[in-house]
Amino acid sequence: MKEHIAVDRNTYDQVMLPIYSPAQFIPVRGQGSRVWDQHGKEYIDFAGGIAVVALGHCHPTLVDVLKQQGEKLWHISNIFTNEPALILAQKLIDATFAERVFFANSGAEANEAAFKLARHYAIARHNPYKTKIIAFHQGFHGRTLFTVSVGGQPKYADGFGPKPADIIHVPFNDLDAVKAVIDDHTCAVVLEPVQGEGGVTAAAPAFIHGVRELCDKHQVLLVFDEVQSGMGRTGKLFSYMHYDVTPDIITTAKALGNGFPISAMLTTVNIASVMTPGAHGTTYGGNPLACAVANVAFDIINTPAVLAGVEKRHNLMVNFLNDINQKYSIFGEIRGKGLLIGAELKAPHQGKAKDILQLAAENGLMLLSAGGDVLRFTPSLIISEEEIAQGMERLEQVINQLV
């Protein structure tokens, strides 16, 4: 076998399943909030791996723990437990309402576990007909057949044959719509405190409180998908903490491992008690390598300095976006929480988010979209003010080119 195979962007089209349309450059190295491609070109990273690298690329403390654990123990399966997993579970419990933790590898897997648990709990504690799940238009919960069906975006869910039954979608932030469909056959209401893929729309406090009251009235579990909004992204460790409302189940992933694949589902003793050995599982979930990295990432993120810094950086980025908008009048709304920010394009630039992403890459800036009309910003939680300013300068160059 050859020691080195030369690859470029064209190689992707020749060897990969055509389910993505990646940028024309290939990143090969990252440090903090900067990335370099195969040709040495530098980029400011406002994408953060889609809200994953909360502490930036190749954080030295995380690199050290990865090396250290890599020389100890990588994987042993769920037939045994391990120290890093137990330590991480205890940290998550100490920092939240939760009392029990399940580890998996991705947000989709954590959500799959949450939805299965919600149905299993309702059937075990109530009756076999209490299986309806209420979710929201423009929601996103993963790509398994169950999670993509709970997600409220037909463009992702259609075309794969019969979907899991008993899933209803209603408009986000519409409490009356929830009231109209919730009943004693409902097992769960599932929502993102901030819809990420759906356009970076935050839940209104009155809506969250109203949903909690409806869930209590009908003995329904409230599930918060915090895969994108959790782990400090909005300035609190988890977004539910902004609302003075306690969900029954939360899921987290993405920034939990700062890029090393790991996810978790958190719940209470009472709800977890319906699960027995064999009721659910995963081969890789909670492996010592992932949990060792996540332990250190958690320790760094869950500090006053990092969490308070999120709001400061939010204000700085929004101020820059407002300044750009003053000059070019391109955004209809700038919204979001913390460092999960959306800038909605207005006419005549609606639908051009992907074009802006391409222009941004050409100008040395990594950006995201949330649909065709919204630019999404999910940088590192510790990105420097200088890097924010440089990135926004590059964004303004892009907007100037566009208009």
UniProtKB/Swiss-Prot annotation:
User: Where, per the database record, does this protein carry N6-(pyridoxal phosphate)lysine?
Assistant: K254
Q: What's the main place this protein lives?
A: cytoplasm
* EC number, as in UniProt: 2.6.1.11, 2.6.1.17
Q: Which InterPro entries match?
A: Ac/SucOrn_transaminase_bac, AcOrn/SuccOrn_fam, Aminotrans_3, Aminotrans_3_PPA_site, Class-III_PLP-dep_AT, PyrdxlP-dep_Trfase, PyrdxlP-dep_Trfase_major, PyrdxlP-dep_Trfase_small
Sites binding pyridoxal 5'-phosphate sit at G107, A108, F140, D225, E226, V227, Q228, T283
Q: Which SUPFAM superfamilies match?
A: PLP-dependent transferases
Alphabetically sorted, this entry's keywords are: Amino-acid biosynthesis, Aminotransferase, Arginine biosynthesis, Cytoplasm, Lysine biosynthesis, Pyridoxal phosphate, Transferase
State its cofactor: pyridoxal 5'-phosphate
**EC class name:** transferase
Q: In which pathway does it act?
A: Amino-acid biosynthesis; L-arginine biosynthesis; N(2)-acetyl-L-ornithine from L-glutamate: step 4/4; Amino-acid biosynthesis; L-lysine biosynthesis via DAP pathway; LL-2,6-diaminopimelate from (S)-tetrahydrodipicolinate (succinylase route): step 2/3
A GO CC annotation given for this chain: cytoplasm
> Any idea where this protein resides?
Cytoplasm
Q: Please share the entry's free-text remark on the cofactor.
A: Binds 1 pyridoxal phosphate per subunit.
Q: Which cysteines are joined by disulfide bonds?
A: none
Full protein name = Acetylornithine/succinyldiaminopimelate aminotransferase
Q: How does it assemble?
A: Homodimer.
An example Gene Ontology molecular-function term: N2-acetyl-L-ornithine:2-oxoglutarate 5-aminotransferase activity
Q: Where does N(2)-acetyl-L-ornithine bind?
A: R143, T282
Listed GO biological process terms: L-arginine biosynthetic process; lysine biosynthetic process via diaminopimelate
User: What would be the name of the gene that encodes this protein?
Assistant: argD
UniProt source species: Photorhabdus laumondii subsp. laumondii (strain DSM 15139 / CIP 105565 / TT01)
Classify the source by domain of life.
Bacteria
Source organism phylogeny: Bacteria, Pseudomonadati, Pseudomonadota, Gammaproteobacteria, Enterobacterales
**Its family?**
Belongs to the class-III pyridoxal-phosphate-dependent aminotransferase family. ArgD subfamily.
Q: What this chain does, per the record?
A: Involved in both the arginine and lysine biosynthetic pathways.
Which reaction(s) does the protein catalyse, per the Swiss-Prot or TrEMBL entry? N(2)-acetyl-L-ornithine + 2-oxoglutarate = N-acetyl-L-glutamate 5-semialdehyde + L-glutamate; N-succinyl-(2S,6S)-2,6-diaminopimelate + 2-oxoglutarate = (S)-2-succinylamino-6-oxoheptanedioate + L-glutamate
Q: Does the keyword Transferase apply?
A: yes
Which Pfam families is this protein grouped with? Aminotran_3
